[in-house]
Amino acid sequence: MASNFWTSTHYKELKDPEEVNVVHPLDAQRGISVEDFRLIKLHMSNYISKLAQHIKIRQRVVATAVTYMRRVYTRKSLTEYEPRLVAPTCLYLACKAEESVVHAKLLVFYMKKLYADEKFRYEIKDILEMEMKVLEALNFYLVVFHPYRSLPEFLQDSGINDTSMTHLTWGLVNDTYRMDLILIHPPFLITLACIYIASVHKEKDIKTWFEELSVDMNIVKNIAMEILDFYENHRLFTEERVHAAFNKLATNP
C-alpha cells in the first residue's frame, strides 16, 4: 500500500498547507476572501454528498469526487469554473474512475431537484463539456488514495474491537473530506489522526501501539487538531455566509 502511494501521482500532487487556500486573482477581484473560498468548497463538498445520497453512490466515490473538486480549485478560479457545475461533474468523473458508472441523465435529474434556480439548471451537454475541462485541470491525474484503505488494518492491528469507536473513526474519516486534508497529507496519516481522536474521546489507551508505528506523532496530532478546529468552527459556516460568498461571485469586478 505504502509503496504504491509513494510512487503515485497522488503523492506527487500533495500541496503545502498554504497552497490550498490561495484565492485566484479573478476571484479576489470579486471580493472573494480566503474564508469565502473555504465556505464555497465546503458547501460544494456537501452538495456532492447530497447528490450521491439521492443516486445511491458509495462513499469512496464521493471522497474521490470531493478530492477532484478541491484539486481543481488549487489551479482554477471559481469565476471561470462555476462550482455548481464543477462539483457534479467531478462526481460524474469519479464514478467512472471508481468503476461505479452513473448515467449523466440521472445525475442531471437530481441536480435539477437540488438546485431550483433556473440559472443553474444544467443539461447533459454541460456536464460533458465541463468533464474535459476538469480532466485538463487535473492534468488527467485521476488516482486517489483514501484513508479508508488503511483504516480496517490499523483498527485491527491496534486491537480495537469496540464497535462504537470503530463507527466514530469511520465518521471522522468521512468528515475529513469537508476539509483540504486529502490534498496536503498522506492518507494513512489522516487515518491515524482519526484513530487518535477516537481513542482519546473513547478513553482507549493505545499509546504503545502508536509508538510502535514509527510515525511522527507530532504530525498526527497536528492533523487531529485541524480536524477538531474544523468541528469547533463549523457552527460559523451558516447558509447566510455561503449565499453571501456566492453573491460575490455573481458580481462584476
From Swiss-Prot:
Keywords (A to Z) from UniProt: Cell cycle, Cell division, Cyclin
Gene Ontology molecular function: any one: cyclin-dependent protein serine/threonine kinase regulator activity
UniProt keyword annotation of Cell division present: yes
GO biological process: cell division; regulation of transcription by RNA polymerase II
InterPro entries, per database record: Cyclin-like_dom, Cyclin-like_sf, Cyclin/Ssn8, Cyclin_N
Superkingdom of origin organism: Eukaryota
Similarity-based family: Belongs to the cyclin family. Cyclin C subfamily.
Name of this protein: Cyclin-C1-2
Primary gene name: CYCC1-2
